[in-house]
Design a protein with these regions (language model features):
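Short alpha-helix adjacent to the SAM-binding motif of class I
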Residues: 136-147, 151
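SAM-dependent methyltransferase catalytic region
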Residues: 152-157
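Core catalytic lobe of class I
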Residues: 1-131, 135-138
């Protein structure tokens, strides 16, 4: 089976404040699980080595260091670009996919939503198996995938 390993937190920007609410939810949890022996990118397992390098804003190393923690900072999509009420940027999923899989590995997403996990997996050369129960959102996922790749999506029953 799949083992629950950790809950990661996505801190979102661009929150709309509501005066009647004392504490606003500015995060979303992400459950990370594994099946079998986990793969961790060797680049990301050399934590002390990475932390001892020059870490500054505006370079890839800065992002790589932040990707090692269970709190993720990633910008939300502007509302004008969202096709799904809770659409996430594919770059949010790239963090976990890049760190915990290698090209050719499979990724399982049980809440397909807008297909951002599928897009991230495709861009990183992983196979993604996605489940989405809502036919409207299933169609959205297929549309986004086919637009990105120029290929016909494969639906499994």
């Amino acid at each position: 089976g799949i083992q629950n390993k950790r809950v990661c937190i996505w801190l979102k920007n661009n929150q709309m404040s509501t005066p009647q609410i004392a504490f606003h939810k500015v995060f979303e949890p992400c459950i990370y699980g594994i099946r079998g022996d986990p793969f961790l990118s060797k680049y990301h397992t050399a934590f002390n080595e990475v932390m001892n390098k020059e870490v500054g804003t505006g370079n890839r190393l800065h992002g790589d260091v932040l990707d090692m923690f269970s709190v993720w900072l990633e910008k939300r999509l502007p509302a004008s670009e969202m096709e799904h009420p809770t659409q996430k940027p594919p770059t949010l999923y790239e963090k976990a996919i890049r760190r915990c899989t290698k090209p050719g590995d499979s990724v399982l997403e049980l809440f397909g939503g807008s297909g951002s996990t599928l897009i991230a997996a495709e861009q990183l050369k992983r196979t993604c198996y996605l489940v989405e129960l809502d036919p409207l959102f299933s169609s959205l996922i297929i549309k986004r995938y086919e637009k990105l790749t120029g290929q016909k999506a494969t639906k499994l029953s």
